[in-house]
Curated annotation (Swiss-Prot):
This protein's record includes keyword Hydrolase: no
Gene responsible for this protein: groES
UniProt function note: Together with the chaperonin GroEL, plays an essential role in assisting protein folding. The GroEL-GroES system forms a nano-cage that allows encapsulation of the non-native substrate proteins and provides a physical environment optimized to promote and accelerate protein folding. GroES binds to the apical surface of the GroEL ring, thereby capping the opening of the GroEL channel.
Keywords: Chaperone, Cytoplasm
Protein name: Co-chaperonin GroES
Keyword Transmembrane helix: no
Subcellular locations according to the entry: Cytoplasm
Gene Ontology terms, MF aspect: ATP binding; metal ion binding; protein folding chaperone; protein-folding chaperone binding; unfolded protein binding
Cellular component, GO, one term: cytoplasm
Top-level lineage group: Bacteria
Species the sequence originates in: Fusobacterium nucleatum subsp. nucleatum (strain ATCC 25586 / DSM 15643 / BCRC 10681 / CIP 101130 / JCM 8532 / KCTC 2640 / LMG 13131 / VPI 4355)
Pfam families assigned: Cpn10
Subunit structure as annotated in this protein's UniProt entry: Heptamer of 7 subunits arranged in a ring. Interacts with the chaperonin GroEL.
Entry's Gene Ontology BP terms: chaperone cofactor-dependent protein refolding
SMART domains to which the protein is assigned, alphabetical: Cpn10
Length: 90
């Protein structure tokens, strides 16, 4: 799939949380809160002014209730507005 966001939007690939605790206990999908995950990798950018400083490959934290989900086979992506990106990790 070749998706290019337009305007001040960003295509993100959510980063799955570790489903094991530090002590090695495996968590069920219900207890790991995967539905509220809010970290992702930037896959593509639009051309908006608010995107300054964000690059493809950056790891970001975004508003967990934002964006539109898109699926490509088994891979899930999100398209979010630039203002929904809260921070760059690293």
């Amino acid at each position: 799939m070749n998706i290019k966001p337009i305007g001040e939007r960003v295509l993100l690939k959510p980063i799955k949380k570790e489903e094991k605790t530090k002590s090695g206990i495996l968590l069920s999908s219900k207890s790991s809160n995967t539905d509220t995950q809010n970290q992702a990798e930037v896959i593509a950018l639009g051309k908006g002014e608010k995107l300054e400083g964000i690059k493809v490959g950056d790891k970001v934290i975004f508003n967990k209730f934002s964006g539109n989900e898109i699926e490509d086979g088994d891979v899930k992506y999100l398209i979010v507005n630039a203002e929904d990106i809260l921070a760059i990790i690293g």
